[in-house]
């Protein structure tokens, strides 16, 4: 099963959620890996922030987690333009995933930035994150902010997913502290989009996910 982890924006906590989801699924006996096909922003010595987290905290090497890496902290489509020696090879990406599927029960695919990020610009169209999801994934984990603005972000995000006819998704509000505004954000989002929203606190562990959230992912259901 391929699970795509995306969010309403960049720096929303996708890596944080992915890391603990990986650990939570592992403790339940699943063979799990993480794959981030497009990683920007080198931090020196051929190292990249998210890939370093997966290496140091999940014991997953770069040869498992990465495919395309770029020096500058920019959108993948611009990174490809800057580093012109790199070209998107769709078949290489699919082959990498097929190789991982032969070894693991579940693959957590972390996207770059939010749901509408362009990945590669061809002469007549863009290859978008939504195309990547359609090509690779069975289910989506949508990471939401808990702060002011979360309601608008969540509604736009969900409407876009529905409009693009993407696979089923589950929503999780990151860095949730149970403050009055966060409680209202959670309640209002659920009423407006007619879906359950799960939460993950700032000081999380693999035990922090509710069993209902894990079962939703394992079952791959919408709602």
From Swiss-Prot:
It is found in: Cytoplasm. InterPro entries: DTB_synth_BioD, P-loop_NTPase. One of its GO terms (cellular component) is cytosol. Its cofactor is Mg(2+). ATP binds at residues 11-16, 50, 110-113, 174-175. It comes from the Bacteria. One of its GO terms (molecular function) is magnesium ion binding. One of its GO terms (biological process) is biotin biosynthetic process. Its EC number is 6.3.3.3. Signal peptide: none annotated. It catalyses: (7R,8S)-7,8-diammoniononanoate + CO2 + ATP = (4R,5S)-dethiobiotin + ADP + phosphate + 3 H(+). The active site is at 36. Its main location: cytoplasm. Mg(2+) binds at residues 15, 50, 110. Pathway: Cofactor biosynthesis; biotin biosynthesis; biotin from 7,8-diaminononanoate: step 1/2. Keywords: ATP-binding, Biotin biosynthesis, Cytoplasm, Ligase, Magnesium, Metal-binding, Nucleotide-binding. Substrate binds at residue 40. Catalyzes a mechanistically unusual reaction, the ATP-dependent insertion of CO2 between the N7 and N8 nitrogen atoms of 7,8-diaminopelargonic acid (DAPA, also called 7,8-diammoniononanoate) to form a ureido ring. Belongs to the dethiobiotin synthetase family. Homodimer. This is ATP-dependent dethiobiotin synthetase BioD. It comes from Staphylococcus epidermidis (strain ATCC 35984 / DSM 28319 / BCRC 17069 / CCUG 31568 / BM 3577 / RP62A). The gene is bioD.
């Amino acid at each position: 099963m391929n699970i795509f982890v995306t969010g309403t924006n960049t720096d929303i906590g996708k890596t944080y959620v992915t890391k603990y989801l990986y650990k939570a699924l592992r403790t339940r006996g699943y063979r799990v890996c993480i794959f981030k096909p497009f990683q920007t922003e080198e931090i020196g010595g051929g190292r990249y922030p998210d890939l370093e987290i997966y290496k140091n905290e999940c014991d997953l090497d770069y040869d498992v987690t990465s495919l395309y890496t770029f020096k500058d902290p920019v959108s993948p489509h611009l990174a490809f333009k800057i580093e012109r020696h790199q070209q998107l090879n769709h078949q290489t990406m699919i082959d990498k995933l097929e190789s991982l599927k032969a070894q693991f029960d579940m693959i957590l695919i972390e996207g770059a930035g939010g749901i509408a990020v362009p990945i590669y610009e061809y002469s007549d169209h863009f290859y978008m994150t939504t195309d990547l999801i359609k090509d690779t994934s069975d289910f989506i984990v949508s990471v939401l902010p808990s702060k002011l603005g979360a309601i608008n972000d969540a509604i736009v995000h969900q409407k876009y997913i529905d409009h693009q006819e993407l696979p089923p998704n589950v929503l999780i509000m990151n860095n949730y502290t149970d403050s009055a505004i966060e409680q209202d954000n959670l309640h209002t989002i659920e009423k407006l989009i007619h879906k359950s929203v799960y939460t993950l606190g700032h000081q999380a562990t693999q035990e922090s996910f509710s069993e209902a959230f894990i079962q939703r992912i394992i079952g791959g259901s919408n709602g």
